[in-house]
UniProtKB/Swiss-Prot annotation:
Residue numbers binding ATP: L65, G66, R67, G68, E69, F70, G71, I72, T73, K88
Residues that bind Ca(2+) 1: D373, D375, D377, K379, E384
Residue stretches of biased makeup (Basic residues): 18-28
Entry domain remark: There are 3 contiguous domains conserved in the CDPK subfamily: a kinase domain, an autoinhibitory (junction) domain and a calmodulin-like domain. The autoinhibitory domain (323-353) inactivates kinase activity under calcium-free conditions.
Domain (EF-hand): residue spans on this chain: 360-395, 396-431, 432-467, 468-503
Annotated region (Autoinhibitory domain), positions in chain: 323-353
Chain residues carrying a lipid of type N-myristoyl glycine: G2
Gene3D superfamilies, sorted: EF-hand, Phosphorylase Kinase, domain 1, Transferase(Phosphotransferase) domain 1
Full protein name: Calcium-dependent protein kinase 30
Activity control summary: Activated by calcium. Autophosphorylation may play an important role in the regulation of the kinase activity.
Length: 541
């Protein structure tokens, strides 16, 4: 399939004449995007129940705290009480699709309906103007989970048990209230303040969904290292959150993810195999009770996996204050520091990629859908797909087109809707195109030498938290610089970016379709079918 349509060029002059095309379902045009300044009507509201007044009437926006795919988080001060808060300002122009708009609405709904909890960040208010949606929330200024652990110096199994109990309690509270988080990872937990006894809080509900008992989901979302096997199989429920919490616990105890490889497909295969390594240091120092809990949280069969309440009832969690208080050694702290810094490096690279992911790339796919949808019903039949692929120059044979159709047709209606079609095209085009990585590499290669050297890496990782230690730079260089010449070349950089990267930081829609594409690959090469034969579990396609 290497020659599928990697070089496809869409010719707008080739589209059907004298036909008024309707937009494909699920991919409505962005109502906030007005590049020519011709808007003559008020924009639609993203959050119907948001405050009608201006946010500046109530709050003072200060310095920037962080930046994401859709907007910027600012320090925010209540004019009357002087309380310090955080304001996440989401740019409407960056909500490119109806799916993006729905994501924001759902995040606000979930944060508004969850009961107050000491370990969940509180949404204080929402405001909306013509340009932005503003979410005013509790301020968490105590730093990320791993950064705090590294800074403390003394790190023990008892400390890991305390963190695990907090995360399990958040999961339990979400599930009791019909919320599946779907994106649990260390970066989504911040400490409220810098005090030693500060509360740890869950901060990001952007991929969360409401669920009913027995309801199953098919959308592939989340972050690579933390995905449960049933997510890759597109047939899952709230048990995925316990799996993700188990991955975090494994990392807390030994400093590295349980399922790792140099490519996303390798990570996915490791997750499907589900083999846990308890032989490397420091596992010999860790209690059998802790290992038992990790195994039960990372049980590949979701029907046998512990629930969040059962995690909280486990003896290791119940006796957290009695867990071994012996330091796990510098090896775990140094691994956690390297893991945290590597994530920071990837986040900076993804920010560069996000700025170069043009809306035109997605427009090409939209236009291809319109071109192939001969009867304008918002769906593409097998015959339309076959004819359309031939029209744009694809050399795919009949068996391969049939396989693509079968695997991508998630709802089994014999046709592809827009979302399913996007998955097929990304699968064929391999949207991780070289230009995106090249732009990010050039951002770090300040002197244009063709290499990222130690000082350039140090500069890239220096932020409001200060400069990284020499040991961290050395560790990252050691891992990424595979030819051991003391610098990172372009090929080594690409390998790093393809291993376990959270692509949602570049584009949430891109991430969704990317992992759907990965699922297609695994199904096509038989990996999932082999896994099912070994485990007796089935995949819902």
């Amino acid at each position: 399939m290497g020659n599928c349509i990697a070089c496809v060029k869409f010719d707008p002059d080739n589209s059907k004449p004298n036909q008024k095309k309707k937009p494909p379902r699920g991919r409505q045009r962005n109502p906030y995007d007005d590049p020519d300044g011709l808007r003559t009507h008020a924009p639609l509201r993203v959050i119907p129940m948001s405050h009608q007044s201006q946010i500046s009437d109530k709050y003072i926006l200060g310095r920037e705290l962080g930046r994401g795919e859709f907007g910027i988080t600012y320090l925010c001060t209540d004019r009357e009480t002087r309380e310090a808060l955080a304001c996440k300002s989401i740019s409407k122009r960056k909500l490119r699709t109806a799916v993006d708009v729905e994501d924001v609405r759902r995040e606000v709904t979930i944060m508004s309906t969850l009961p107050e909890h000491p370990n969940v960040v509180k949404l204080k208010a929402t405001y909306e103007d013509n340009e932005n949606v503003h979410l005013v929330m509790e301020l968490c200024e105590g730093g990320e989970l791993f950064d705090r652990i590294v800074a403390r110096g003394h790190y023990t199994e008892r400390a890991a048990a305390t963190v695990a109990r907090t995360i399990a309690e958040v999961v339990r509270m979400c599930h009791v209230n019909g919320v599946m988080h779907r994106d649990l990872k260390p970066e989504n937990f911040l400490f409220a303040n810098k005090k030693e006894n500060s509360a740890l809080k869950a901060i990001d509900f952007g991929l969360s969904v409401l669920f009913k008992p027995g309801e199953r989901f098919t959308e592939i979302v989340g972050s690579p290292y933390y995905m449960a096997p049933e997510v890759l199989k597109r047939n899952y429920g709230p048990e995925v959150d316990v799996w993700s919490a188990g991955v975090i616990l494994y990392i807390l105890l030994c400093g590295v993810p349980p399922f790792w490889a140099e490519t996303e497909q390798g990570v996915a295969l490791a997750i499907l195999r589900g083999v846990l390594d308890f032989k490397r240091d420091p596992w010999s120092q860790i209690s059998e009770s802790a290992k038992s809990l990790v195994k039960q949280m990372l049980e590949p069969d979701s029907t046998k996996r512990l629930t969040a309440q059962q995690v909280l009832d486990h003896p290791w969690i119940q006796n957290a204050k009695k867990a071994p208080n012996v330091p796990l050694g510098d090896i775990v702290r140094s691994r956690l520091k390297q893991f945290s810094m590597m994530n920071r490096l990837k986040k900076k690279a993804l920010r560069v990629i996000a700025e170069h992911l043009s809306i035109q790339e997605v427009e090409v796919i939209r236009n291809m859908f319109t071109l192939m949808d001969d009867d304008n019903d918002g769906k593409i039949s097998y015959l339309e797909l076959r004819a359309g692929l031939r029209k744009v120059g694809s050399q795919l044979g009949e068996p391969e087109i049939k396989l693509l159709m079968e695997v991508a047709d998630v709802n089994g209606n014999g046709c592809l809707d827009y979302g399913e079609f996007v998955a097929v095209i990304i699968h064929l085009q391999k949207m991780e195109n070289d230009e995106h990585f090249r732009q990010a590499f050039m951002f770090f290669d300040k002197d244009g030498s063709g290499y990222i050297e130690s000082e350039e890496l140090r500069e890239a990782l220096t932020d409001e938290l200060g400069e990284p230690d020499n040991s961290v730079i050395i560790d990252i260089m050691r891992e990424v610089d595979t030819d051991k010449d003391g610098k990172i070349n372009y090929d080594e950089f690409v390998v790093m970016m393809k291993a376990g990267t959270d692509w949602r930081k570049a584009s949430r829609q891109y991430s969704r379709e990317r992992f759907k594409s990965l699922s297609l690959n695994l199904m096509k090469d038989g990996s999932m079918h082999l896994h099912d034969a070994l485990t007796g579990q089935s995949i819902a396609v």
